[in-house]
UniProtKB/Swiss-Prot annotation:
Residues covered by region (Disordered): 833-854
Protein name: DNA mismatch repair protein MutS
Source organism of the structure: Bacillus cereus (strain Q1)
GO biological process, one term: mismatch repair
DNA damage found in the keyword field: yes
Keywords: ATP-binding, DNA damage, DNA repair, DNA-binding, Nucleotide-binding
Amino acid sequence: MTQYTPMIQQYLKVKADYQDAFLFFRLGDFYEMFFEDAVKAAHELEITLTSRDGGSSERIPMCGVPYHAAKNYIEQLVEKGYKVAVCEQVEDPKTAKGVVRREVVQLITPGTMMEGRTIDEKENNFLAALTHFEDGSYALACNDLTTGQNTVTLLTGSVEDILLEVYATGSKEIVVDSSFSKDELNKLTETLKMTISYEDATAIPEGLEHLVKNVSQAKLIKAVGRLFNYVIRTQKRSLDHLQPVEIYYTNQFMKIDVHSKRNLELTETLRTKEKTGSLLWLLDKTKTAMGGRMLKQWMERPLIQKERIEERLEMVETFVNDYFLREDLKEKLKEVYDLERLAGKVAFGNVNARDLLQLRRSLLQVPAILEAISLLDNAYAARLIQGADPCESLTELLGRSIQENPPLSIKDGDIIKDGYNDKLDQYRYVSKNGKTWIAELEKRERDITGIKSLKIGYNRIFGYYIEVTKANLGALPEGRYERKQTLANAERFITDELKEKETLILEAEEKIVQLEYDLFTALREEVKVFIPKLQHLAKVISELDVLQSFATVSEEEQFVKPVLTTKREIFIKDGRHPVVEKVLNGKLYVPNDCIMPENMDVFLITGPNMSGKSTYMRQLALVTVMSQIGCFVPATEAVLPVFDQIFTRIGAADDLISGQSTFMVEMLEAKNAIANASERSLILFDEIGRGTSTYDGMALAQAIIEHIHDQIGAKTLFSTHYHELTVLEESLDQLKNVHVSAIEENGKVVFLHKIQDGAADKSYGIHVAQLAELPDSLIARAKEVLAQLEGQEEIIIPKRVEVKMQEQEVIPEPVVVKEAPVEIEETKVENEEESQLSFFGGEQSPKKQDKPVLDTKETAVLAQIKKIDLLDMTPLEAMNELYRLQKKLKKG
């Protein structure tokens, strides 16, 4: 390093502590980057890469951005998942001896951004910290630096369960210890696209102990400690707005795995990854940013406590029934700014005068809001506003201190009102009267000299001056003015009197700006005292905002209040998919019932492609989610149980994820449901098994249906194109066939989108191909092939029957169903015995044989068949074994 200049040595020393971040190194009016940082930043920011001499034999790569535009460039890098360390000059270059002292004043990361375009006003910006313990458990702590919110929970289960909870937080960055499993880190980065950071310190930092008073479990404290240490190390400033840590338990909320949340498009659409078109988009009628954030949190974690859900529903009902109350509340909420983030800016020290005006305007609405809610005859409402302080003294303080239209910068003056501070008023009097004196002097000098164009001006370099055009210089009295500056067309002069007044005026103006800054920072400290009260108010207002949002959308869309039942039954009359109905924008939407009494667990849904099977399934899931967040639901009547989990396997049909799924993903998602679902869960399986061959797929579908029916008992909607499976209704007493109806008119299919009892009789796949405008010749050929296939052999699928036999309850029994061809031939026997099927594809016996003659290979295969324990095999395993043996026989 000694070969480099002192400044580059200083840069390298600072950079050594921030290897995983871009170092914005302040040099005068620019932030410069060097070496690898410069090369990478020039590429990412599309700025010019240059070089400079740094004392070594080779020039050093360099790029830079102006300090006044740095915010935009920093946001670009953070938006891409990078970190930026901001290194400032911390001493005056004029007084510095040698290299100016520089220090990193802040590390800006995806999880610690306070403001900018990457921060959505209606979304939290959580930073997560994950701690893994030897017993296999994890503790997850989260902080939103913009609002001060802190949460922590203890997690057990698979890595997938952990990923689900991290995903639910929406965190963009996660902090782990340096020994964290690389495999698990890969899952975090690949599955959730998160920035990884490291922090090994886990003790609660000094001064923050009060935030964990209600946390007693050592594991949770360790996770919070890791989180707080990272925040302090990166931010290097006041964190007075951090709120007490809230403990939550995942078993308090409905579980919806990552894939199911995406499939259901709860908060964003699958295709665009945007809010528009999602359930959140439909339900968000909130008037405040903090209300919007709370709504999203509620949607990420629906409740499972019946009493809490009903409390919310009752409040929504109150707002639905009282139009004037609701509209008055909405008008007040429109004037409420983001109290949580304003409090955060106050604590961070980056609040400006306009922010404080927003705070005052917000507080002016609070008394009326609290008064209106206090008049409601509702225990939940009374409990909600209990302890809420309207902060009237703060409103009064801000009202008499801040100008009505202050500048953005707090260093330009014109912030503080007249009458707030006596000394400031005195300085302003001097400044104002001094300027009046200047105007009078200009008029007097014009009269004395007779020069009408004479003027008195000011600039920062020369101060005040008298300017006379060269054409009028001859009219000046000799010795009256002292020459100051010569211009192309004029001369500038000063007088002793003008210099004396200038000193008084400039001193006053300089003191005004400094005093206003000092008064503002003191005011900011006074506001800090109110931060806890402001944060409590923010929670109250946010919750009221979400509840009125539910009421507003419920009335607009004609939703109905659901009745929650402790029974395992679903009764939905005229249910609708809320988002699809909204997108149709007034066009006729066909509602459908979903009636599943306690003794009915599985709906096996068949019907044409594009007929609405997937929409019907999602409809039930969304109705369930809406009910359990406390919103009315799209139906004319709804009685629902409280579900503990929702599992979906909804594939590429109906233009949702369009071919992006694989058979392995399908099986993994099915496995997740089968392994974790309870009888209180909701399972939605759409076309399970279509990602593999017909027989494998059919076998898997049947086995999964039987397992859910016999072993789990969860309410399940299972759609399929395997019409052969509809015979399961005969053997599974809690399964019912339903189908989506369609009719043919003049050779064309018309989808009715109506769910009806019974199985569908055909798929209409070729009609869908016609709708897609495939060539007529291709359609005609498809019809020919279909006619040939429909005239061929029958498939025999295993049907489960209840037969007691050596303590076994299930044995396979053939059930004949019409379907596509199978490569088996029938062997006819010329006696009274029933005809048997030759699974080996052998020729028909021309006559009766007392004992078949088998060759060596056939004898070996027969021996293997005799050893097979069919009762110990799944349908898929049996079919695979049969296929293997058949191949063995066919080999010549």
